[in-house]
Design a protein with these regions (language model features):
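Short, glycine-/small-residue-rich phosphate/pyrophosphate-handling segment
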Residues: 148-169
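N-terminal nucleotide-binding beta1-loop-alpha1 segment
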Residues: 1-22
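Conserved donor-nucleotide/metal-binding helix-loop-beta segment in metal-dependent transferases, i.e.
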Residues: 112-138
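Acidic donor-binding segment of Leloir-type glycosyltransferases
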Residues: 50-78
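Short aromatic-hydrophobic micro-motifs that form the base-stacking/packing surface
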Residues: 103-105
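A short, N-terminal amphipathic alpha-helix
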Residues: 33-53
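Short phosphate-binding loop-to-helix
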Residues: 69-101, 159-162, 190
Length: 202
């Protein structure tokens, strides 16, 4: 495997539109700031990865569009508009925008750092699909040697069935999926406490 795309899906840090489950605990403004900080850390790790791995093509896929000033604070990163009605469609569209091998992540999983991404890239050299299972039954990273939209179809998004159903789609396509170490994301107040306590490696 030579070139590989590392795709980051990111929402603009607009108060009230991001990290909504944190709002009751910290307020809309602070929730947006937390989202921006998480995203900045993730993008920073990916930039460090790209500097040490010239085969990496870093892409930031933005929602609702690329116009927010936050996205333009990373001038060396290529910006793209997310497209799709649900998360599955948005992920499929980004992955299938090129036939190159690709790894796709969000911005709210602290354990997905440079070292974690390096491992994902290495495993993707040997397996058609790599997935980072999350504690909540979803996943925080998916990589594919050959991007396929079918893996994202008929999934009950935002439920604890996401990982199981995704693995079923892979099996139906005869794609062996390699599971990376389990991760967690920052969605609720308890996750925020964990992140602030520096528990990203657990």
């Amino acid at each position: 495997m030579t070139e590989i795309r590392v795709i980051i899906l990111c929402k603009a840090p607009v108060p009230g539109a991001v990290k909504t489950r944190l709002i009751p605990a910290v307020g809309a403004g602070s929730a947006a700031n937390i989202h921006a900080r998480l995203a900045t850390e993730t993008i920073g790790d990916c930039l460090a990865l790209a500097r040490s791995h010239p085969e990496v093509q870093l892409e930031l896929w933005c929602s609702p569009d690329t116009q927010h000033a936050f996205f333009h604070s990373f001038p060396t990163v290529s910006l793209f508009n997310q497209q799709g009605e649900d998360l599955g469609e948005r992920m499929a569209h980004a992955l299938c925008a090129s036939s190159l091998p690709a790894i796709l992540i969000g911005t709210d999983c602290p354990p997905v750092n440079k070292a974690y991404l390096q491992n994902a890239i290495e495993q993707l050299k040997h397996k058609p699909v790599v997935i980072a299972p999350a504690e909540d039954g979803g996943y925080g990273l998916i990589g594919m040697q050959v991007p396929s939209a079918s893996v994202f179809q008929n999934i009950e998004w935002s439920t604890d069935k996401v990982l199981t159903e995704t693995l079923s789609r892979c099996e139906e396509q005869e794609l062996e999926a390699f599971l990376l170490p389990e991760i967690w994301d920052v969605d609720e107040a308890k996750d925020l406490d964990r992140w602030l306590a520096g528990d990203a490696k657990s």
